Amino acid sequence: MLSCRLQCALAALSIVLALGGVTGAPSDPRLRQFLQKSLAAAAGKQELAKYFLAELLSEPNQTEIDALEPEDLSQAAEQDEMRLELQRSANSNPAMAPRERKAGCKNFFWKTFTSC
């Protein structure tokens, strides 16, 4: 997680430095290609997006809850349930789902699952 943050910070820093150098320099097509590639690489970071979503959702809303009237507390509870649901969906990874085996299937080969 720390290395991902560090990579993103370095990518952002390099983009800022590149943009700062571009303002005074003549237009170079190689520089444009470099910037486009670096922006495309930074946009594909799904883990970073999940992390920021989880961090945003985990921030406490205690001041909002204190300001609500008693009838609004049920709405706050529903919002908390929705927030927990979003956290669960952000943290779930379908690629890591455990393998399901049908009844009667046996593992004959010790390295892999057999298909039944």
From Swiss-Prot:
One of its GO terms (molecular function) is hormone activity. InterPro entries: Somatostatin (IPR004250), Somatostatin/Cortistatin_C (IPR018142). The modification Alanine amide is found at residue 43. It is found in: Secreted. C-terminal amidation of the neuronostatin peptide is required for its biological activity, including for the regulation of mean arterial pressure. GO terms for biological process: regulation of cell migration. One of its GO terms (cellular component) is extracellular space. The keyword Cell inner membrane does not apply. Coiled coil: none annotated. Keywords: Amidation, Cleavage on pair of basic residues, Disulfide bond, Hormone, Secreted, Signal. Residues 1-24 form the signal peptide. Transmembrane segments: none annotated. Residues 25-88 form a propeptide. Disulfide bonds join 105-116. PANTHER family: SOMATOSTATIN. Belongs to the somatostatin family. This is Somatostatin. It comes from Bos taurus. The gene is SST.
